[in-house]
């Protein structure tokens, strides 16, 4: 693939320790005659192979299905990954961010953000919390107190 060739060249010429894709659904595999779900599956597998071949982590940001917006409980789950179950299958880790304050400004802790490790092939799953600092567009350590 084009991205694989560019990454290999960069690793050889300058070094490459990490690749971040922002975001997966904007990529094209160049495959014709296939549906979008098949294309995203191919892209996901290609990124997994590239990560293994180059020996580096590849982080791919992905959209969620719109069905999340229609549910009462908005916290994402693995089946919410958009356009492909292969993203979940190929990934070594799947991490979601969830902030109740995004959906409900009247919640008790609108800046409390959950980092949810939903899949970790070589470790434990679980959650941690950060504080969203919207005016700076960044996260900070969660103080455990209301903000």
Briefly describe each language-model feature range.
Residues 38-40:
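VWA/integrin I-like adhesion module and closely mimicked acidic/polar interface patches used
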Residues 23:
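Walker B catalytic acidic pair
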Residues 61-63:
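Conserved H-loop
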């Amino acid at each position: 693939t084009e991205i694989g060739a560019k990454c290999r060249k960069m690793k050889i010429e300058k070094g490459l320790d990490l690749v971040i894709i922002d975001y997966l659904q904007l990529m094209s595999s160049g495959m014709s005659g296939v549906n979008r779900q098949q294309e995203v599956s191919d892209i996901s597998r290609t990124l997994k192979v590239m990560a293994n071949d180059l020996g580096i982590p590849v982080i791919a940001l992905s959209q969620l299905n719109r069905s999340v917006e229609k549910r009462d409980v908005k916290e994402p789950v693995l089946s919410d990954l958009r356009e492909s179950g292969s993203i979940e299958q190929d990934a070594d880790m799947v991490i979601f961010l969830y902030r109740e304050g995004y959906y409900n400004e009247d919640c008790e802790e609108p800046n409390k953000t959950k980092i949810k490790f939903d899949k970790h092939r070589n470790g434990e799953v679980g959650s941690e919390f950060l504080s969203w600092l919207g005016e700076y567009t960044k996260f900070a350590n969660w103080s455990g107190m209301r903000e």
